[in-house]
Regions:
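C-terminal domain-boundary segment and adjacent tail
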Residues: 85-144
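Residues at or immediately flanking beta-strands
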Residues: 19-22, 103
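Alpha-helical scaffold elements lining the catalytic groove of polysaccharide deacetylases
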Residues: 1-19, 29-75, 86-89
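Periplasmic/luminal catalytic loop of GT-C fold multi-pass membrane glycosyltransferases
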Residues: 77-78, 97
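Active-site-proximal beta-strand/loop segments in catalytic clefts of secreted hydrolases
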Residues: 24-28, 48-51, 79-83, 107-110
Length: 144
């Protein structure tokens, strides 16, 4: 895990000139160990709660529908830069968000400050009071 984090971070920094502090576990799969190690290495594990399904090459219309239906403040929408219809769907999605009064912001502005913990659904919570029912092995696998 540490090696993969470092390799990816080094690559991003070599391209952008900026260090990374956030990462999305591949396929959304993670457990307490991944979160612990990422934090020890200075990273915050980020999940999403709205999947555009762009990776399945669904139509732009279906993507727009998925990303605008039941959207809420603080939602994180997953997109991929190589999806087939993202260039057609994204302007419509962003226009919808703007009309609905939402602002698209960097994830770094969504994160809670201070000690936090992440529940089984990938939602960040303040650590005070600390979670009382942690099993020590919380994990999540995204099912599509």
């Amino acid at each position: 895990i540490r090696e993969e984090l470092k390799r990816c971070s080094d690559l991003v920094q070599s391209i952008t000139g900026k260090p990374t502090t956030l990462f999305r576990p591949p396929y959304g799969e993670y457990n307490d160990e991944v979160v612990r190690i990422s934090r020890e290495e200075g990273y915050e594990c980020i999940q999403w709660n709205v999947d555009s399904l762009d990776w399945k090459n669904i139509s732009a219309e279906d993507m727009v529908r998925r990303c605008t239906k039941n959207v809420n403040p603080g939602d994180i929408v997953l997109f991929h830069n190589d999806s087939k219809y993202i260039l057609q769907a994204l302007p419509q999605i962003l226009e919808y968000y703007q009309r609905a009064g939402y602002r698209v912001i960097p994830i770094s502005e969504l994160l809670l400050e201070g000690e936090t913990w992440i529940d089984h659904a990938g939602t960040q919570h303040l650590a005070t009071p600390p979670p009382s029912a942690s099993t020590g092995n919380e994990s999540r696998k995204i099912e599509q």
